A protein has these predicted regions:
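C-terminal substrate-recognition/cap domain of FAD-linked oxidoreductases
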Residues: 2-179, 183, 187
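Activity-critical C-terminal alpha-helical subdomain
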Residues: 198-253
Length: 253
């Protein structure tokens, strides 16, 4: 995390793709991409399982610019005692990253449910959010939870929480899903990054923003659609009943 922050705040340019995985996801990716069974495993000597973090990145653009970004990443990586795995893992990830979602429906047939929840954090509270949300995710026995950031900025980044659980009913799935969204709001993270806030996430939005800020949306809605005819019950929960809203932080009521 600290290395990623330093790279994004270096003012030397940004990688076009940038991803940092937590230890649980790192161990899974190194197995999925056959690093543990390839000659690259010798580069991992001294790195303990569940205590290592995988960083992937690309640079694009002018040759000089890309070279400068690469030099900065290499310098910061050395500072934090990282070790290069060549470009093999990046290429494996790039060519296989869209394959996993196709397994979702098949897994559901066997009672295995998986989903991705994302949030937005500042660098200053990233470690806290990661720890608190993962603690809630793992409170359910026999749960796989992987986490990574994949959209980084000088001010912060997103966090993806991907869980895999055994769940036979929609009610059970929604109950677990709700506990994670509760944890995200309590931790101080924004309830979404770029996936947006639809019907499922809407109850948590006002509790994150606060009534005054969220009230601006009500003013616009009342001006343009005072009868609430457009997309009722959807979008960001402007027509939610008070009892259905989630206010879980002491500093926002």
């Amino acid at each position: 995390m600290n290395a990623a922050r330093e790279i994004m705040q270096s003012e030397d340019g940004y990688p076009s793709a940038f991803r940092v995985s937590d230890p649980e996801e790192t161990d899974m990716m190194l197995k999925l991409y056959n690093v543990d069974d390839s000659p690259l495993r010798y580069f991992l000597a001294g790195f303990e399982p569940m205590k290592r973090s995988l960083m992937l990145g690309f640079t694009e653009g002018d040759k000089g610019y890309s070279k400068n970004v690469r030099k900065t990443i290499a310098r910061v990586a050395r500072k934090y005692h990282a070790r290069s795995l060549t470009g093999l893992v990046c290429k494996s990830w790039e060519h296989g990253r869209f394959n996993d979602p196709y397994l979702r429906d098949t897994l559901l047939d066997f009672g295995i449910a998986t989903d991705t929840l994302e949030c937005t954090v500042n660098w200053s509270n990233m470690a806290q959010v990661h720890e608190e949300v993962r603690k809630i995710c793992h409170a359910r026995p026999n749960t796989v939870v992987t986490t990574h950031l994949s959209h980084a900025y000088p001010q912060g980044a997103n966090l993806y929480f991907i869980f895999i659980i055994h769940s036979e009913t929609c009610e059970d799935f929604k109950k677990y899903h709700t506990t994670i969204l509760d944890a995200i709001q309590k931790s101080g993270a924004a309830i979404s990054h770029h996936h947006g806030v639809g019907k499922m996430f809407a109850p948590w939005l006002e509790g994150y923003m606060g009534r005054k800020k969220f009230g601006i949306y009500h003013v616009l809605k009342d001006y343009f659609d005072k009868d609430y005819l457009m997309n009722p019950g959807e979008t960001i929960g402007l027509d939610l009943e008070e009892k259905d809203k989630k206010f879980l932080r002491d500093d926002i009521k």
